[in-house]
């Protein structure tokens, strides 16, 4: 699960304008990074333009998924990730960054034209959400629940195995008890015929 970029765009008034972006292309070779970065910026703008206000959508392109949330207030957020990244976490991140961006940068700052704004929190969110299980409480609880369930299954299996071993031990004890009674009876018979006077 990997996040490649997080972008905030101005959707209204058109044309779409990239306000700020953060990307992590370290998983690509040095020579591929610039072309992949350009591709992601181009595709981010294209997907944002084609998403209606108030809607969310996911667009797959090659090995990437672009998660888009175009809000009714003129802001649009786009996340580029791999196909394994969970949808719920992606949209949680989009809501969070768009709300925080709007709080720190009122509409008057970005609605009037081609501006690029500084929003260093994007880099923080990009690194924090690389591991969605650590960033998302529900996923973290689900992971802990799965781990607990695995431990519980192993414990139950070992208890059942011990129970089977106890059953075997009881059976052997019964067999030994039966054999010792038979030995006692045969020894008593043999001793009864050989009385020394």
Swiss-Prot record:
The modification Cysteine methyl ester is found at residue 194. PROSITE patterns: LONGIN, SYNAPTOBREVIN, V_SNARE. Keywords: Cell membrane, Coiled coil, Lipoprotein, Membrane, Methylation, Palmitate, Prenylation. Residues 7-126 form the Longin domain. A lipid is attached at residue 193 (S-palmitoyl cysteine). It comes from the Eukaryota. GO terms for biological process: endoplasmic reticulum to Golgi vesicle-mediated transport; intracellular protein transport. Residues 195-197 form a propeptide. GO terms for cellular component: endomembrane system; Golgi apparatus; plasma membrane. GO terms for molecular function: SNAP receptor activity. CDD domains: Longin (cd14824), R-SNARE_YKT6 (cd15867). The keyword Coiled coil applies. It holds the Pfam family Synaptobrevin. A lipid is attached at residue 194 (S-farnesyl cysteine). The keyword Membrane applies. It is a lipid-anchor. It is found in: Cell membrane. Residues 137-197 form the v-SNARE coiled-coil homology domain. PANTHER family: SYNAPTOBREVIN HOMOLOG YKT6. Belongs to the synaptobrevin family. This is Synaptobrevin homolog ykt6. It comes from Schizosaccharomyces pombe (strain 972 / ATCC 24843) (Fission yeast).
